[in-house]
Amino acid sequence: MIQQVHSHPDIYRIRVDLPDNSLQYLNSYVIKGVSGNLVIDTGFNRPECKRALCQGLQELDIRLQSDTSLFITHLHADHSGLVGLFAATGCPVYMHPVDYQYLVDSEDGSTWKAAEDNFMREGMPPAEIKTQFSNQARTFSPDPHFPVNPVHDGDCLHLAGCDLQVIHTPGHTPGLCCLYLPKEEVFFTSDHILFNITPNIQVWYHMKQALQRYLESLQKVRELPVRLA
């Protein structure tokens, strides 16, 4: 399902259903420009999500090629799962390097092993640990071998004919980044700010005091002029 949410620039929301998941769906956003396009987040790395996203892009007459860029807001599989689809066709991919490194580390199991060791130290029952690591975040993650253009807090990107500001908001993940269009006052919040549920704040072995960092990130964007989020 596609919905236009803003005109000049033309911004669309593609609903990507997440089968067998309590989150139900992901909103993938598309800025369609005259000389290029920007896709923000993808859905899981599974056929149903790929089909929904590709159908939406096809309806918008957007082809996966070098003039279409992909911005991954953070590493979670419902946002990054289909990054390989874009990278394989020459689309530039943008992502914060901290979250990208987590994806790389997860391939050899070191990310999950560090979390498992931490749970064991804290006394979590082994059966519960096993349940934690059989979730979809692991099953439907992307292959991390893709070229990435690293972005950092305060970076200004010119994509799809728009000037976008990168705002690093650690908390939900260490490298989560929002995108802001200052001229239009449009704010892509990703999972930093949700509307009817609260973001999950978990333990990260490379980021101490995740909840404190999240609250600081909320304060960081509190006074941002926003007409549409």
What feature does the model see in each segment?
Residues 1-6, 109-113, 123-124, 219-228:
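Accessory terminal helices/loops
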Residues 48-49, 58-157:
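Active-site HxH/HxHxD metal-binding segment of metal-dependent hydrolases
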Residues 21-23, 149-151, 170-173:
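A short catalytic or substrate-binding loop motif that flags glycine-/basic-rich loops and adjacent residues
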Residues 4-60, 179-190:
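Conserved beta-strand hairpin/beta-sheet module of binuclear metal-dependent hydrolase folds
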Residues 37, 44-46, 137-142, 156, ...:
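Metallo-beta-lactamase
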Residues 9-16, 135-140, 160-162:
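Short Pro/Gly-enriched beta-strand edge/turn motifs at strand-loop
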Residues 2-3, 27-29, 149, 154-155, ...:
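Residue-level detector of beta-strand structural context in well-folded domains
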